[in-house]
Structure formats: structure tokens, C-alpha cells
Design a protein with these regions (language model features):
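C-terminal beta-signal and adjacent terminal beta-strands/loops
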Residues: 272-274, 278, 374-381, 389, ...
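Flexible loop and strand-edge segments within Gram-negative outer membrane beta-barrel domains
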Residues: 2-13, 27-106
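Outer-membrane beta-barrel transmembrane domain signature of Gram-negative proteins
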Residues: 98-180, 345-347, 359, 371-373, ...
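Gram-negative outer-membrane beta-barrel transporters
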Residues: 173, 177-178, 269-271, 293-382, ...
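Surface-exposed extracellular loop regions of Gram-negative outer-membrane beta-barrel proteins
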Residues: 1, 13, 28, 36, ...
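Short loop/turn motifs that connect adjacent beta-strands in outer-membrane beta-barrel proteins
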Residues: 26, 68-74, 116-121, 175-176, ...
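Outer-membrane beta-barrel signature, preferentially recognizing the C-terminal barrel domain
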Residues: 47-70, 192, 206, 212, ...
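Transmembrane beta-strands of outer-membrane beta-barrel pores
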Residues: 1-3, 24-26, 35-39, 70, ...
Length: 444
């Protein structure tokens, strides 16, 4: 709740989805369309000067996909369109003129192909993607503003960019050895530069029937979001001259895979360039804004390990304990925040994370899921003008469900121990909360 006692983490949502398909002798076609509405109190997530923020989002999405059924050659085209409408209220219900309205449209075309020969599998294709935004706050001034439906306000800012990419990949599969190598060439109208190339290699070797080792090297690019480029309001100051993030990722690991036990251990090293972040200098006072910046270089080393026990494989489908899994992850970055500098993303991360989960069959279709999580986050947050370090915390969740063929009834409780903790920024996370519901699957 906010300081006035009103709700500031409430939410209401509705969704609708349709999917159809056609199966022919030469081609299969799938299509879908959906809509979702969500209204939610966003607490102090976007800024600390208001604890009564609110957001309304509406999303439309549709796509058509096809695949030919040739013996050696397959063609997989798809076309999609997504629209998102957003109204953000920094001060909930204080008037339309203070709100931030935005509408994004993403239109894309994928042309994927692959050919299978005695030399392996060769995949190639292209993607064309256009994304645009019109807004009251984000983007460059528009020559022709667009009316916002339902209110006497115009979208008077916007930005549009198109991405083109072409990819080529070849995979060789031998009895115990697999090698895949490829490259992506990409060009975006936003940065005005030519095509850039991003290679990748994946290799694996079967040591024994149940043991496999693997290694990979991949490169990637991420463009700054519209928010990172233009969000300048309520304690935030964006930089529209941000550069795109670039990443080189190395990973190696070993897997043990059987029907009853699955275990994996991996080590990775990421070399990041121009990593995008929001930072704030607390030494300059509470009015100092968050600023979007590029970190010139940021290297990350990590370890992940997990094991899953499927007890149904050993004692049958009616086992009381159906399965149990536990995982651990560790991350270390070679750049730390400077004194009084608070980071939202790049320099704020989970140093340690432990997750344990089990699924129990209580009776017939009555099941219980229990989940335990322990996290230790690196970074700082500000509260009441003070800089605080994150503290480790433990969470326990449970979900009880009756799982029938066409319907499901459930009740779940999160943060059963009612822990007080901060997981991002200076926003206190909810204590214990319970919800119940039902789902039903219609067959047409």
C-alpha cells in the first residue's frame, strides 16, 4: 500500500487467444491471434518520488506460419504483427495531461529454409523486422501527430527503425560428435551503418551413453530500447546517442542424462562491450536523476549446476514424490560500482542463487508443488536518502492443484514465511499473498 493507505500493487488482467491450423499433403499452416489487457499498480518501480504509480497495457498479436513437407528441402515462412498500447500514470488518477501514452507496432517476415544431405543439415534464411513507436514522451517530434483514441491528446513523438538480417548455418552430426557453425549478417536503419557479421560455433561429444560434453562460442548485438533512448522524466534522463550492446559468449559444460536422473554443470565467460545500464550518483543529492549510459567493457564469469531426480521412473507413475530438483548459479563481474554510484542492471546482479523444488502426488489428481529459493544480490539501492546494500533472503512458495484432463483448480501461496526483502531498486517486495483460480480447456 502507499503512504496514504491505498493499494499500489493491485492488478486486473484478461486474455483471449485463438489458434488454428491446416494440414495438407505438401504443406502445414498454423495461425493464431490474441489480445491481453492488464491494469496494475507499479508501486515505486519507475521512480521513488511517487508510491502510487499505475500502468495500463493492451496487447494485440497475430501470426501465420507455414512449412513445406519436402523430403530433403523445407521452407518455413512466417509473418507476424504485434501492437502494444500503454498508459503510464506516475501519479495515479491525477489527470490525463500528466500521463505517458505510447503505442508500439512490430511487423516482421521470416523466410527460413533448411536442406538435409549426406554432408549434414544446412539452414539459411532472412528476417525483416520493422518496429515503431508513437508516444507523448518517447521519440523525436512528429511532423503529423496522431490522435489518441478516447482522450483529447495527441501522440506527438515517435521513432521507426527497420532491421534486416541474413543467416547461414551448417550442422554435421556423426555417431558421437556434433558440430554446428554459422554466421548472421545484420543491418539496422537506426544506426546508419552497414551490415555487421556475428559468427557462432557449437560443438558436443558423447563421452558415453549417458555423458556428453559441449562447448560454444557465440556473438550477439542488442539495440537500445526506446525507453533507454528517450525516457526523460520523473527522475530519469535518457541518452538518445546510446550505442548498441555487443557480446562475445564462451560456454562449456558436461551433461549426465538418464530417464531417472538429469544433471548438468556449465561454466561461461561473457565479454560485453557498450553494455547499457541506468546509473545514479547518490552523492549529488536525492534530485540527481537516473541516467542511461554505456559501460565500455564488462566481463562476466559464471557457473551453473543442476540435478533432477525423476522418482516416477524408479517407483512408477503413482509415486508420492514425483520429482525433486535443485540448482545453483554463481556470477562474478569484473567491474564494481564506484562509491555512491547505484546501478539498475549491469552492475546489479545475483551473485548466488539456490533453487530447490519438488512435486508431490497427494491423492488421485491432487498435486502439491513446493519451491524454495535463496538469493544473494550484489548492488545497492537508495531509501530515505541512504544507500543500502542488498541482503540475502529466503523465499518459500507452494501450489496445490487438482489437475484433470480439461480443467485445473489451484490455490497458491507465495512468500509463505512473510519475508521482508528488496529484490530490485528500493521497492519492498510483497509479503505473503495467496490466490486461487481455475482454468478450462475448450476443444473445438
Amino acid at each position: 500500500r502507499n503512504k496514504a493507505g491505498g493499494l499500489n500493487a493491485d492488478f486486473k488482467q484478461s486474455k483471449g487467444f485463438y489458434q488454428g491450423n491446416y494440414r495438407g499433403d505438401q504443406v502445414d499452416v498454423k495461425w493464431y491471434a490474441g489480445i491481453s489487457n492488464k491494469d496494475f499498480g507499479s508501486n515505486t518501480f519507475y521512480g521513488v518520488s511517487s508510491d502510487d504509480q499505475f500502468e495500463h497495457t493492451r496487447k494485440f498479436y497475430t501470426a501465420v506460419q507455414a512449412e513445406t513437407k519436402g523430403q530433403n528441402y523445407h521452407f518455413k515462412p512466417s509473418v507476424y504483427w504485434n501492437r502494444g498500447e500503454d498508459r503510464f500514470e506516475y501519479f495515479r488518477g491525477k489527470g490525463e495531461n500528466t500521463y505517458n501514452y505510447g503505442r508500439t507496432d512490430v511487423l516482421g517476415l521470416n523466410l527460413n529454409n533448411y536442406v538435409e544431405t549426406v554432408l549434414g543439415k544446412t539452414a539459411f534464411g532472412a528476417e525483416f523486422r520493422n518496429e515503431g513507436i508513437i508516444s507523448t514522451k518517447l521519440g523525436e517530434p512528429l511532423d503529423n501527430p496522431t490522435k489518441i483514441h478516447g482522450v483529447d491528446i495527441d501522440y506527438d513523438k515517435g521513432l521507426n527503425r527497420t532491421n534486416m538480417s541474413f543467416h547461414l548455418e551448417h550442422t554435421v552430426i556423426l555417431p558421437r560428435f556434433t558440430l554446428s557453425a554459422g554466421v548472421i549478417a545484420t543491418k539496422n536503419t537506426w544506426d546508419g551503418e552497414g551490415f555487421k557479421f556475428y559468427p557462432g560455433v557449437d560443438v558436443s561429444y558423447q563421452l558415453a551413453r549417458d555423458w556428453k560434453i559441449y562447448a560454444s562460442y557465440n556473438t550477439s548485438l542488442r539495440l537500445p530500447s526506446f525507453t533507454e533512448l528517450y525516457y526523460t522524466m520523473q527522475g530519469y534522463k535518457a541518452d538518445k546517442h546510446l550505442k548498441a550492446e555487443k557480446m562475445q559468449a564462451f560456454e562449456g559444460g558436461i551433461k549426465y542424462l538418464t530417464p531417472g536422473v538429469k544433471a548438468t554443470v556449465s561454466v561461461y565467460r561473457n565479454h560485453g562491450t557498450n553494455m547499457i545500464d541506468w546509473i545514479r550518483d547518490t552523492s549529488k543529492g536525492e534530485d540527481e536523476p537516473w541516467q542511461s549510459v554505456n559501460h565500455t567493457k564488462l566481463n562476466t564469469t559464471g557457473v551453473e549446476a543442476s540435478v533432477l531426480f525423476n522418482f516416477r521412473h524408479f517407483v512408477g507413475q503413482n509415486a508420492f514424490v514425483k520429482d525433486f530438483n535443485v540448482s545453483y548459479s554463481y556470477i562474478d563481474k569484473d567491474k564494481e560500482s564506484e562509491p555512491n554510484i547505484v546501478s539498475q542492471y549491469a552492475l546489479e546482479y545475483l551473485k548466488h542463487k539456490v533453487v530447490a523444488q519438488t512435486n508431490l502426488r497427494l491423492y488421485s489428481k491432487l498435486n502439491l508443488n513446493i519451491s524454495y529459493r535463496w538469493q544473494d544480490r550484489i548492488g545497492n539501492y537508495t531509501t530515505d536518502g541512504k544507500t543500502m546494500s542488498y541482503k540475502p533472503y529466503t523465499l518459500l512458495d507452494a501450489r496445490l492443484s487438482w489437475d484433470a484432463k480439461q480443467y485445473r483448480l489451484f490455490a497458491e501461496a507465495n512468500n509463505i514465511l512473510n519475508k521482508t526483502y528488496y529484490d530490485h531498486g528500493n521497492v519492498p517486495q510483497p509479503g505473503i499473498w495467496v490466490r486461487a483460480g481455475a482454468t478450462y480447456r475448450f476443444n473445438f
